[in-house]
Amino acid sequence: MPTDIRFGPFFSVGEVEMARDEYYFKWTAIGYRVELHLNETMDDRGRRVWFVVGKRYEPTTRKEKGI
């Protein structure tokens, strides 16, 4: 069963892309499958903010689990 992922807010595209890449590499390196995308919205002051959203799937095979 996948785990929902949502983290942020980030106030620049560079920050949110760096966070997404860091999270992706961290979790795929230990065997998880990760689907991430960026979500852009506006805060209460009308500024653009971004979140990283997606799903993380548990390793399903013994090889993926490192067994």
Regions found by a protein language model. Give the residues of each.
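A short, charged, amphipathic alpha-helix used as a generic interaction element across diverse proteins
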Residues: 1-5, 10-37
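Short aromatic-glycine-(Arg/Gly/Cys) micro-motifs in beta-strand/loop hairpins
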Residues: 1-5, 38-67
